[in-house]
Amino acid sequence: MAPPPAMKPASRKRGPPAPDPVELPPPGFVADRAEAAARVERLLRYQFRDGRLLEEALTHQSFADDAVSYQRLEFVGDSALGLAFSNFLYLTNPTLGPGPLSTLRAANISTEKLARVAVRHDLYPLLRRNCPRLDLLVGQFIETVKQEPEDDLSTVPYGGSVVKAPKVLADIVEAIAAAVYVDCKFDLEKLWKVTRWLFEPIITAETIDEQPVTMLHELCQKHGKMAQFKTWQKGGMTVVNVFVAGELVGIGSSEQKVIAKLNAARDATRKLAGAKKQVLTTGVGNGLGDEIGELRECKQKLNEQCSRQNWPKPIFK
């Protein structure tokens, strides 16, 4: 009797092949480049003669190796906006000296100020890029800016209350400004006419504050006191405490150390002008502290005199 035929293993029924992974565009990205360009032109009320300039201004260096990024335009825009603001501030502030004028110019074209311009006018979704981490950082900053009072300009030049502005946002504004500047044959007056309203409200001598840490030190020095900053980590946050005359007068926190210090200085300055005012007017500040303050002022003046005369820096013992 012949043996039974060998049984073939049952074949597994295979389903259709899995589809190739689909690369989704970054959140908020405007894939239609004609629409992206049109949005900028509508925003500026300006039609580009050379559309390639605008496409270049809206291309990040991470997008593709063969694409021309905004880096060269950003270089030009940084200088062009600086000169445009110099002219404007010079003409509108006839009594201000070069120091205050420089401070106002720096405040109006700071990374923090220009980044908020980009957020206010929704420019980041128009940028061609390929950097998920950049999207994350910008997204966090946008959410933070939404919580800021719209009419509070005092914190803008030096940093907000939570996160530092990603430079890419300021770069976009500078690159777009440069695209206009080059497109109109380097006509500075035309550039200012087209872009000025983007920067409203412009920071003026009436609305600007001093750098918070500098303001705190100057306030303390007037009363013969010294502010001390103590930094420590709590989870993923940096916490900064400010002590004056041994008393805690300010606290600030952020994921970024520089912002935490700014927040602490702001908090301390507010409290020393209010609830903690007695810290500046009691203790060593009534006697020895006054002498210390005067001595510090004398040392500062001597250092300044030596610097002006190119003399060796004095050594205090």
UniProtKB/Swiss-Prot annotation:
<dbReference type="InterPro" id="IPR036389">
    <property type="entry name" value="RNase_III_sf"/>
</dbReference>
<feature type="site" description="Important for activity">
    <location>
        <position position="167"/>
    </location>
</feature>
<keyword id="KW-0460">Magnesium</keyword>
<dbReference type="GO" id="GO:0005634">
    <property type="term" value="C:nucleus"/>
</dbReference>
<dbReference type="GO" id="GO:0046872">
    <property type="term" value="F:metal ion binding"/>
</dbReference>
<keyword id="KW-0464">Manganese</keyword>
<dbReference type="InterPro" id="IPR014720">
    <property type="entry name" value="dsRBD_dom"/>
</dbReference>
<dbReference type="GO" id="GO:0003723">
    <property type="term" value="F:RNA binding"/>
</dbReference>
<keyword id="KW-0378">Hydrolase</keyword>
<feature type="region of interest" description="Disordered">
    <location>
        <begin position="1"/>
        <end position="26"/>
    </location>
</feature>
<dbReference type="GO" id="GO:0004525">
    <property type="term" value="F:ribonuclease III activity"/>
</dbReference>
<feature type="binding site">
    <location>
        <position position="174"/>
    </location>
    <ligand>
        <name>Mg(2+)</name>
    </ligand>
</feature>
<protein>
    <recommendedName>
        <fullName>Ribonuclease 3-like protein 2</fullName>
        <ecNumber>3.1.26.-</ecNumber>
    </recommendedName>
</protein>
<dbReference type="InterPro" id="IPR000999">
    <property type="entry name" value="RNase_III_dom"/>
</dbReference>
<feature type="domain" description="RNase III">
    <location>
        <begin position="37"/>
        <end position="185"/>
    </location>
</feature>
<comment type="function">
    <text>Cleaves double-stranded RNA (dsRNA).</text>
</comment>
<dbReference type="Pfam" id="PF00636">
    <property type="entry name" value="Ribonuclease_3"/>
</dbReference>
<keyword id="KW-0694">RNA-binding</keyword>
<dbReference type="GO" id="GO:0030422">
    <property type="term" value="P:siRNA processing"/>
</dbReference>
<keyword id="KW-0540">Nuclease</keyword>
<dbReference type="Pfam" id="PF00035">
    <property type="entry name" value="dsrm"/>
</dbReference>
<keyword id="KW-0479">Metal-binding</keyword>
<feature type="domain" description="DRBM">
    <location>
        <begin position="211"/>
        <end position="274"/>
    </location>
</feature>
<dbReference type="GO" id="GO:0005737">
    <property type="term" value="C:cytoplasm"/>
</dbReference>
<feature type="compositionally biased region" description="Pro residues">
    <location>
        <begin position="16"/>
        <end position="26"/>
    </location>
</feature>
<feature type="binding site">
    <location>
        <position position="74"/>
    </location>
    <ligand>
        <name>Mg(2+)</name>
    </ligand>
</feature>
<keyword id="KW-0255">Endonuclease</keyword>
<feature type="binding site">
    <location>
        <position position="171"/>
    </location>
    <ligand>
        <name>Mg(2+)</name>
    </ligand>
</feature>
